[in-house]
Structures are given as C-alpha cells and as structure tokens.
C-alpha cells in the first residue's frame, strides 16, 4: 500500500494548464477504452454473469465521489428488505493486490483495503476482494449471498450486471471534461447516461432539506446528502453526540478524495476546525498525529479503520450516513424484486 496515498492533479478541476504529456496520452487512452467497450457491446468479448442480481456502484471519474457511503447504505437497505447482500471489491491500495481474500471487520487494512474493511465493519456483510470482480461475485454466491454489489466496478465489463448506479460529486462534477490523464474521466461523460440510476452527491444534509429527485438536466437524477451527528471515541467508549464539541477547537483529519467537504461539515456544526488533509488512501502512523496541541482529533471512518492499532482517548471517528429519497429505494427494490422473480432467487 502506498505510504503517501493518491492526490488529485489540480488541473483536473481548475484552469491550471494541462501538462503536454497528459494531453498527448489522453486520446490514446480514449481510443483504448472505446475499443474495449465496443468489443463487449458487440459480443466479441464475453460478459459472464452469476445466478443472482448484480448491482454495480461506480463512476465515470477517477477518485472518490461518495461510492462507499452509498454502498454501505445500499447494503443496509437490502438487509432490511430481507436480502443477503455481498460486496465485491478490488480492494484498492492493499499490499497484496493479486491475492483474493475475505475481508472481515478486523482484517488489517494492509490486507483488505480501507474501503472494504470499512464496509465489512459497518454492515457485517460478506466482503470479497479480488482484482477479478467476476471471481469475487462467484465466491459471494457460493458463500450464500443472494445479491452482489460490485463496488467501483462500472468499467469492469467482464462481469455482467443487472443494475448500474453512477455516483458523481455535486461540486466537482466531471471536472474539465477530459479523459485520463488530462482530466478525471475514466470514460466519456456521456457513458453516465447509460446507467440505470444516477446519483449526485450534494454533500452535507441540512436539518430541513429532504433528498429528492430534481429535474434531470443530464447531471445526476437522485440527490444524495451526507449527515453526521455523533462521534465515536476510538478507545472503545460509548458514542457521543457531535453537538458536545460545538464551540470547541479540534484537529480534523481526512485522507479522502475531497477533504474539505469533511472539514466544512464539521464547521457547519459549530466546531472550530484545525484542518489536516492527507492524500486519499494515506497509510497513517502515530507520528502523523503529532500536532503540537492536545485537542480532540476527529476523522472520517475511512481514516479511522487505519488508525485502530494506535488509537487513544484523543482520537474520534465521525460516522457518516448517506441519505437518499424514499422514491429511490422504492424504485431500486422494485426492480430487484422483478429480477429475482425472473432469476428464481
């Protein structure tokens, strides 16, 4: 696992000049992905399925857009509806990326990847990491799962899917609109129009706003908002309301794709934030928290799973909940029930 994590090039989302090598490589990359997709669409490369419904949660941009909170919410909703979901993931950033394995809540992040460990910890669902998503899906079915969620698998065309959910960041959107490496796009933005559900992550939920389906102007249909209302001491003590920190200063740590979003959510709750942004998927050491002042340290749960080995009474994780409109869940579950009846699940 990279000790530094990954950082987003500034020119993807601002007016910074794009380096010449990136501009040269982008058309080459674009031709390669267009050819690859055409091979699958025309049947020259076979897609392979499993005998249960498959949901792919992904994005057409590189980097984080809110897929993990949505995946966690999706697993919880399916469990509530009587399904036994399993999650297939590549396990980005783990040390032995070529090894397939089951991920449990206590699996070391170096072996399972931060997001799969977080999903297992939050949901208790079966989680399988494998660079081959098809093999992961088959393993989940053999383990008794009656529905598979493929986390970040939109471009993994070898695995046949029944439902595609695109997630896009409501602030960054599709950046400069260019393909990798000149921009953030893994595929042309028009690819998102093929997805069954398009979710736009609008960030912080307000006390009065209810997620809804806005007019679809080609950019997301279903609003997703993120809420925080508690803090979990990482030394094992009981969770406390986030409001207890209102008016206080804290160190806020975020090693995610868009750290400022987390910092803004804390500030909106009246908390004085001393921000510490790390690269996405950063591997923490105790020394990273030598801030020179003994203030509470708040971090995302994705960061927290990597800090458990050296957690003390000063470290807190902030649970984050994805909120979507009721109509989204009704529409999705209705489609899944029809699929299940056809497949005999």
UniProtKB/Swiss-Prot annotation:
Catalytic activity: a lipid A disaccharide + ATP = a lipid IVA + ADP + H(+)
GO process annotations (BP): lipid A biosynthetic process; lipopolysaccharide core region biosynthetic process
Positions of ATP binding: 61-68
Record field: transmembrane: none
Pathway(s) per entry: Glycolipid biosynthesis; lipid IV(A) biosynthesis; lipid IV(A) from (3R)-3-hydroxytetradecanoyl-[acyl-carrier-protein] and UDP-N-acetyl-alpha-D-glucosamine: step 6/6
Class in the EC hierarchy, top level: transferase
GO MF, one example: tetraacyldisaccharide 4'-kinase activity
Coiled-coil spans in chain: none
UniProt keyword Lipid biosynthesis, yes or no: yes
E.C. designation(s): 2.7.1.130
Keyword Metal-binding: no
GO cellular component: plasma membrane
Keywords: ATP-binding, Kinase, Lipid A biosynthesis, Lipid biosynthesis, Lipid metabolism, Nucleotide-binding, Transferase
Signal peptide start and end residues: none
Superkingdom classification of source: Bacteria
Record-linked NCBIfam families: lpxK (TIGR00682)
Family: Belongs to the LpxK family.
PANTHER family noted in UniProt: TETRAACYLDISACCHARIDE 4'-KINASE, TETRAACYLDISACCHARIDE 4'-KINASE, MITOCHONDRIAL-RELATED
Functional description taken from the UniProt entry: Transfers the gamma-phosphate of ATP to the 4'-position of a tetraacyldisaccharide 1-phosphate intermediate (termed DS-1-P) to form tetraacyldisaccharide 1,4'-bis-phosphate (lipid IVA).
Protein name (record): Tetraacyldisaccharide 4'-kinase
Protein encoded by which gene: lpxK
């Amino acid at each position: 696992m990279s000790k530094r994590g990954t950082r987003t090039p500034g020119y993807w989302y601002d007016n910074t000049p794009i380096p010449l090598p990136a501009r040269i490589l982008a058309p080459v990359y674009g031709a390669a992905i267009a050819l690859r997709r055409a091979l699958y669409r025309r049947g020259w490369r076979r897609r392979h399925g499993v005998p249960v419904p498959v949901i792919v949660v992904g994005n057409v941009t590189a980097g984080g857009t809110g897929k993990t909170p949505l995946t966690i919410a999706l697993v919880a909703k399916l469990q509530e509806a009587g399904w036994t979901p399993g999650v297939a993931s590549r396990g980005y950033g783990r040390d032995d990326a070529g090894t397939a394995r089951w991920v449990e809540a206590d699996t070391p992040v170096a072996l399972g990847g931060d997001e799969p460990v977080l999903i297992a910890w939050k949901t208790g669902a079966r989680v399988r990491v494998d660079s081959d998503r098809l093999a992961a899906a088959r393993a989940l079915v053999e383990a008794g799962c009656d529905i598979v969620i493929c986390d970040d698998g939109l471009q993994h065309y070898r695995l046949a899917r029944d439902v595609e959910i695109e997630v896009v960041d409501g602030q960054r959107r599709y950046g400069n609109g260019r393909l990798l490496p000149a921009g953030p796009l893994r595929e042309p933005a028009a690819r998102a129009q093929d997805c069954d559900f398009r979710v736009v992550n609008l960030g912080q939920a307000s006390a009065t706003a209810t997620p809804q389906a806005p007019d679809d102007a080609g950019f997301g249909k279903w609003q997703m908002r993120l809420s925080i209302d508690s803090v979990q001491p990482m030394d094992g003590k009981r969770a406390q309301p986030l409001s207890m920190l209102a008016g206080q200063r804290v160190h806020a740590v975020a090693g995610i794709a868009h750290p400022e979003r987390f910092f803004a959510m804390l500030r909106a709750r009246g908390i004085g934030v001393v921000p510490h942004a790390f690269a996405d998927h950063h591997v923490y050491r105790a020394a990273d928290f030598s801030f020179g002042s003994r203030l509470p340290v708040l971090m995302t749960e994705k960061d927290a799973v990597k800090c458990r080995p050296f957690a003390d009474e000063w470290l807190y994780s902030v649970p984050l909940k994805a909120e979507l409109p009721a109509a989204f869940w009704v529409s999705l579950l209705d489609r899944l029930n029809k699929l299940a009846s056809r497949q005999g699940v």
